[in-house]
């Protein structure tokens, strides 16, 4: 075996070893690249998913805001309609006259005076235009018209003896009925 052969064998062995190292390095590099590409793909998918979540969240928020705004507008419109109805009822009550007004006023006066003892002197207050009517209705009773109040009609009565004050005005009756029946009124108006 000559020196040339030995050198050639060493070179072949070195080349083979270099080839093995190069292949191992390429394989490792391929693994690193594949891992990096997989990481990049995972990060890209996570970011896309996050963007999709944000888009969905913003869409839901926008939709919720629009629904809330629409609901508030509907409620505002309903409130306006209910106020108009209330105003119309007030106007109808204020427009009562003749026998119907007398009948209602007398009924309210009777209910009011029933709250006081028979021997109590009762001061009665009423709507400006009803003073003559109420004076006529309190004749021969333990009551006297003592003044006017700002109301649609009906009476307010009080007694110094018992410190009782009874409000049976059309206004107070309307408010009471309105409060008690608001849900039913709303359902009838808006078919809920």
From Swiss-Prot:
Organism domain of life: Archaea
The keyword ATP-binding is assigned to this record: no
A Pfam family found in this protein is: vATP-synt_E
InterPro entries noted in UniProt: ATPase_E_C (IPR038495), ATPase_V1_Esu (IPR002842)
The processes (GO biological process) annotated in the record are: proton motive force-driven plasma membrane ATP synthesis
HAMAP family of this UniProt entry?
A: ATP_synth_E_arch
Alphabetized NCBIfam families for the sequence: PRK02292.1
Its protein name is A-type ATP synthase subunit E
Q: Give the originating organism.
A: Halorubrum lacusprofundi (strain ATCC 49239 / DSM 5036 / JCM 8891 / ACAM 34)
Lineage, uppermost ranks: Archaea, Methanobacteriati, Methanobacteriota, Stenosarchaea group, Halobacteria
């Amino acid at each position: 075996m000559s020196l040339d052969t030995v050198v050639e064998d060493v070179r072949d062995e070195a080349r083979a070893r270099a080839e093995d190292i190069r292949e191992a390095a390429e394989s490792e590099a391929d693994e690193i690249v594949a891992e990096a590409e997989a990481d990049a793909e995972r990060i890209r998918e996570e970011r896309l998913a996050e963007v999709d979540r944000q888009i969905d969240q913003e869409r839901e928020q926008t939709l919720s805001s629009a629904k809330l705004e629409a609901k508030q507008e509907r409620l505002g419109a309903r409130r306006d309609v209910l106020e108009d109805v209330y105003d119309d009822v007030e106007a109808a009550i204020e427009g009562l006259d003749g026998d119907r007004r007398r009948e209602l006023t007398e009924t309210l006066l009777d209910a009011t005076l029933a709250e006081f003892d028979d021997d109590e002197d009762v001061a009665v207050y009423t709507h400006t235009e009803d003073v003559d009517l109420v004076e006529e209705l309190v004749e021969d009773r333990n009551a006297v018209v003592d003044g006017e109040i700002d109301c649609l009609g009906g009476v307010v009565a009080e007694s110094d003896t018992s410190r009782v004050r009874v409000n049976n005005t059309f206004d107070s009756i309307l408010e009471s009925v309105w409060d008690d029946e608001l849900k039913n009124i709303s359902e009838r108006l808006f078919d809920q």
